[in-house]
Amino acid sequence: MAVPFVEDWDLVQTLGEGAYGEVQLAVNRITEEAVAVKIVDMKRAIDCPENIKKEICINKMLNHENVVKFYGHRREGNIQYLFLEYCSGGELFDRIEPDIGMPEQDAQRFFHQLMAGVVYLHGIGITHRDIKPENLLLDERDNLKISDFGLATVFRHNNRERLLNKMCGTLPYVAPELLKRKEFHAEPVDVWSCGIVLTAMLAGELPWDQPSDSCQEYSDWKEKKTYLNPWKKIDSAPLALLHKILVENPSARITIPDIKKDRWYNKPLNRGAKRPRATSGGMSESSSGFSKHIHSNLDFSPINSGSSEENVKFSSSQPEPRTGLSLWDTGPSNVDKLVQGISFSQPTCPDHMLVNSQLLGTPGSSQNPWQRLVKRMTRFFTKLDADKSYQCLKETFEKLGYQWKKSCMNQVTVSTMDRRNNKLIFKINLVEMDEKILVDFRLSKGDGLEFKRHFLKIKGKLSDIVSSQKVWFPVT
């Protein structure tokens, strides 16, 4: 069951955890509107109140179609609530196939929208500082929106620009000048991160662990060894643009106005007929069978204590995506009630609550939004019942050396290290659906592409029990 929050609104699921608190999903039980609620415990760290105040101030400045909306905030004692748009198309990383990428025309379209969002941010003096696919969300029309401004800062005010000196972001996406511990301009740093995102979209992999001379892949790039991966998978026109973006000297790096003049950026790409997308989870979608799904618009980046610009802040996590609700344009009057309300209580096991449609189905409603499954590429049906499927999963985890625990009814939390020796955590739910068992994988912390690689490895180990049954998502 959902937990009442304020009048007509329920808290129905935890979306992510971070250094200072968590993100919950709030749903209006009458209109089915959905809003992400960032719940912050201000006592978690000395610098928490100042950081949250800064995040709220920045969010209040934002209003653009390619940036997530900020609805408002309120505080109760030591708890601060931030209310934000809840996007319905998922995270960008879910559209990137590991080691393959995505169709070039899709990458170009997303890159256009990313540029539009970044141009807007820079135009009002804001730098994001943690641009990556986990922080780029899609709405129900596949329009890209930039999310999570926990590391963002103002670099220009009243036409006066200040240099930055803080190391923050996610290592594979940061610009090389950040690692030199010197002052640097803000805008070229975001441009560099956008270039890494474009590389990931076109090649399905990140080019290096970090842009330093100690990294062989980065040295190879500087020596123009484009016959190596990932560059050899990228066509010459977009590769030429990447050669202008991923330039070590920030003063020589291409600017966004010049990116917009680039040949590939302006090249009309033939989209052709829209084909059903075969997914790595044995699912498919078609233009006649599409279900909206909801994902969080927050990434809780870990923040170290201390507020000076010299602090190192690297992000390595993102929220867990997680329920299949219809999302309509959120009405201001309803959100006002949510922002101003005062009642709050905590769900005991929200992940299981929402994944198991039997728990939240409303009697008499054969197609109510609670029963719609999240559309995601990382899932499959098994040929076994729940208990036997669970046993096979446990055996596979042990063979692969994963740490795991049963964290909730029909849910397993798995921890491991990725190829960069960073923590990777994902959750697996076993869901009974049409008398079949669906094994649903969701990223909790870590790199999205690494998560998908581990999913494919696990699925391969379980090939004997994986069903070929596909799910066709209904029109909503």
UniProtKB/Swiss-Prot annotation:
Reactions catalysed, as given in the entry: L-seryl-[protein] + ATP = O-phospho-L-seryl-[protein] + ADP + H(+); L-threonyl-[protein] + ATP = O-phospho-L-threonyl-[protein] + ADP + H(+)
**Low complexity composition-biased segments:** 280-291
Q: Which class of enzymes does this protein belong to?
A: transferase
> What highest taxon heads this organism's lineage?
Eukaryota
Activity regulation reads: Activated through phosphorylation predominantly by ATR but also by ATM in response to DNA damage or inhibition of DNA replication. Activation is modulated by several mediators including CLSPN, BRCA1 and FEM1B. Proteolytic cleavage at the C-terminus by SPRTN during normal DNA replication activates the protein kinase activity.
Q: Point to the regions of Polar residues compositional bias.
A: 298-320
Keywords tagged on the record: ATP-binding, Cell cycle, Chromosome, Cytoplasm, Cytoskeleton, DNA damage, DNA repair, Isopeptide bond, Kinase, Nucleotide-binding, Nucleus, Phosphoprotein, Serine/threonine-protein kinase, Transferase, Ubl conjugation
Q: Where is the active site?
A: D130 (proton acceptor)
What InterPro entries would the database entry show?
Chk1_catalytic_dom, Kinase-like_dom_sf, Prot_kinase_dom, Protein_kinase_ATP_BS, Ser/Thr_kinase_AS
| Recorded coiled-coil stretches | none
Cellular compartments annotated: Nucleus; Chromosome; Cytoplasm; Cytoplasm, Cytoskeleton, Microtubule organizing center, Centrosome
The UniProt function text for this chain reads:
Serine/threonine-protein kinase which is required for checkpoint-mediated cell cycle arrest and activation of DNA repair in response to the presence of DNA damage or unreplicated DNA. May also negatively regulate cell cycle progression during unperturbed cell cycles. This regulation is achieved by a number of mechanisms that together help to preserve the integrity of the genome. Recognizes the substrate consensus sequence [R-X-X-S/T]. Binds to and phosphorylates CDC25A, CDC25B and CDC25C.
Q: What is this protein called?
A: Serine/threonine-protein kinase Chk1
- Identify the taxonomic lineage of the organism of origin: Eukaryota, Metazoa, Chordata, Craniata, Vertebrata
Per the record, the gene is Chek1
